[in-house]
């Protein structure tokens, strides 16, 4: 049986907030890989990018994601670009049910502006254009998720319920496959 729920998707789709809600509803632990990275590095993501570059950030992210195999009954929110790396995808697929949270570029842009967080890859140039560009580059990897939830017109609770419903469907499918041999 799948032992973790792993959230992926672009920045601003609600992964951290919704992941926490799902963990509370399921009485599971919650981990946000970006938060965990900033704790371990004693620096913000913006500082990591500025001082060490994106490649160092991705290296740290990969090391953290490889630790998934030791976790069980966790809801894990990953960074927006984590799934792009093949090894990260492999770890995610082997150790969890991957749910992609989707939203339109306009929705993402509005949410990011409300959060007042600096997103290093989006802050270069026109944010709306950059969001569209990065989403387009990552769409193939996001499409490899086990389930996708469009968050534009749903409340966080509705999204959380949809994730749990999807996870339960997947567990039933796995159980039937095992039972039928």
Each predicted region: which residue ranges?
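Hydrophobic anchor at the beta1->P-loop junction of P-loop NTPases
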Residues: 7
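ATP-binding Walker
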Residues: 13
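A glycine- and Lys/Arg-enriched "phosphate-lid" helix/loop adjacent to the NTP-binding pocket
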Residues: 94-139
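Walker A/P-loop
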Residues: 16
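P-loop (Walker A) phosphate-binding loop of NTP-binding proteins
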Residues: 10
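NTP-dependent small-molecule kinase module
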Residues: 21, 25, 97, 136-181
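Post-Walker A helix-loop "phosphate-sensing" segment adjacent to the P-loop in P-loop NTPases
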Residues: 24-32
